[in-house]
């Protein structure tokens, strides 16, 4: 099973937010939508790694009433859908990493399901998003809090851009599962034992573009740069603290 890396997930989130904003502006009054497509994702094998992968990933964004399902937000229900504030709750996938991507001896970290609560607010032209995720299955553990600021700009009837900045806080359980080195892993990998604490684990910036070929088909692109911070950056598994990622996509709206 292909797991979406944290960097690529963030890039798809930004790209999806821009596409949704563009679609809403172009087709107001039609809240239900079904968008499918394919994306080419360039991403590190894991946060902090120095090997990169180019892989395909499906684009899915379905909304029916207050229910939604998408590759960027998971599946869930919109509890509050106001003109300036939207609050939702649901479940999403929290990625781990493959054995072949991690340093020798560290082993595989299976991703799992997470329960997610999110709030999106519009402050003038600025989009503010916050979410909290509690991991409930898999080898990954703990909780994550994400916050982002974005500024969508419509350059023409077809072309929109959106720069954004974001940060992720992780508790000690998550950081120990993802970035920690246990005694057994230390013996197998020759890396030192490491028990990180919680804190802001990364900050990122991205630029997304969406181009509507027509009312049904759109092209998307996102380039992102993320930097690990705090105890996550000090982990023995971190080779590159600053990592790029990119997504190119084509999507069809039914």
Curated annotation (Swiss-Prot):
Keywords: Cell outer membrane, Membrane, Signal. Residues 1-26 form the signal peptide. It holds the Pfam family MipA. It comes from the Bacteria. It is found in: Cell outer membrane. It is a peripheral membrane protein. One of its GO terms (cellular component) is cell outer membrane. PANTHER family: MLTA-INTERACTING PROTEIN-RELATED (PTHR38776:SF1). Belongs to the MipA/OmpV family. This is Putative outer membrane protein CC_0351.
């Amino acid at each position: 099973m292909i797991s979406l890396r944290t960097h690529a997930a963030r890039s798809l989130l930004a790209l999806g937010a821009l596409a949704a904003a563009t679609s809403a502006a172009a087709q107001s009054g039609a809240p239900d939508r079904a968008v499918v497509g394919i994306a080419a994702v360039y991403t590190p094998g894991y946060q902090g790694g120095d090997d990169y992968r180019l892989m395909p990933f499906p684009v899915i964004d379905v909304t029916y009433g207050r229910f939604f399902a998408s590759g960027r937000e998971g599946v869930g229900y919109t509890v509050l859908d106001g003109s300036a504030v939207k609050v939702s709750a649901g479940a999403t996938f929290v990625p781990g990493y493959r054995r072949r991507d991690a340093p020798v001896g560290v082993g595989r970290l299976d991703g799992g399901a997470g329960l997610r609560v999110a709030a999106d607010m519009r402050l003038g032209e600025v989009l503010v998003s916050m979410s909290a995720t509690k991991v409930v299955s898999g080898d990954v553990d703990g909780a994550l809090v994400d916050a982002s600021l974005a500024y969508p700009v419509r350059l023409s009837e077809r072309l929109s851009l959106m720069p954004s900045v974001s940060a992720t806080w992780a508790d000690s359980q998550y950081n120990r599962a993802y970035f920690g080195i246990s005694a057994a892993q230390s013996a197998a990998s020759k890396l030192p034992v490491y028990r990180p604490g919680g804190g802001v684990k990364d900050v990122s910036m991205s630029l997304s573009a969406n181009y509507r070929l027509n009312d049904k088909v759109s092209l998307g692109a996102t380039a992102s740069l993320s930097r690990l911070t705090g105890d996550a950056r000090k982990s023995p598994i971190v080779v590159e603290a600053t990592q790029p990622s990119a997504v190119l996509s084509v999507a069809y709206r039914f």
